[in-house]
Design a protein with these regions (language model features):
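Karyopherin-beta/Importin-beta family HEAT-repeat alpha-solenoid scaffold
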Residues: 1-220
């Protein structure tokens, strides 16, 4: 597993032999074509990282120590495609690690909150999804709760964004996860009717689960 992790990191950080520069003598068209595949190789490595988190579950937290820095770097890239893929990978890893993500709460929280202001809808949607999972899974309640209202205030306007179906669905799921974990820290009477109005979800049907879980929990 260590060898696999090292190979993945070398790809993500562009140090793998398959990513070596073709040199000055390479044809310009070849270089251009090569650059188009550079990101595909890295994106595939990110997919493998996500698959490892699925396979290892909580045990993946040890490997995240290795992947965190290079993946977070892409999450702050100037390229929206790179940001979106990195933030999406981070979100999936949080969900798969479960409460084992707790030691990484501070850094992940800071990044994901920052990406709520991203100009790219896909990146923003992935950040919303990741934040919901972090609020749900992390046991670092002190760190999470001191940012709760800040997160909610940033999410609330997104509940009215009918133009971005996936972002709207992820926002509904995120707020529902926040309510389920800490119901006393969200104005439920104000937000619950708005969440109900968003049903049925239009694109990300997986987010139905946290919404209905939250409703059932409130009724118990």
């Amino acid at each position: 597993m260590t060898e696999i992790a090292q190979q993945l990191v070398s790809i993500i950080t562009k140090r793998h032999p398959c990513q070596q520069d073709l040199g000055d003598e390479a044809d310009e068209n070849v270089l251009e074509e090569s650059s188009e595949y550079d990101w595909l190789v890295i994106e595939t490595a990110l997919d493998v990282v996500t698959c490892l988190s699925v396979a290892l579950g909580p045990d993946f937290a040890e490997l995240w120590k290795v992947f965190e820095k290079p993946i977070l770097k892409y999450a702050s890239s100037q390229e929206s495609t790179e940001r979106s893929a990195a933030v999406g990978s981070i979100a999936e890893c949080i969900g798969n690690m479960g409460e084992a993500c707790t030691p990484y709460t501070s850094g992940l929280l800071k990044l994901l909150i920052h990406r709520l202001s991203d100009e790219d809808p896909e990146t923003k949607s992935n950040a919303v999804y990741g934040l919901g999972l972090l609020c749900e899974k992390s046991n670092n309640e002190h760190e999470i709760l001191k940012s709760y209202m800040n997160i909610f205030q940033r999410l609330e306007p997104l509940l009215d964004d009918q133009g971005q179906a996936r972002l709207l669905d992820n926002t509904a799921g995120c707020v529902s996860r926040m309510i389920s974990r800490h119901p006393n820290n969200i104005p439920i009477s104000e937000v619950l009717p708005r969440l109900v109005q968003l049903l049925p979800l239009r694109e990300d049907y997986e987010e139905n689960k946290p919404i209905f879980k939250m409703v059932v929990q409130l009724c118990e």
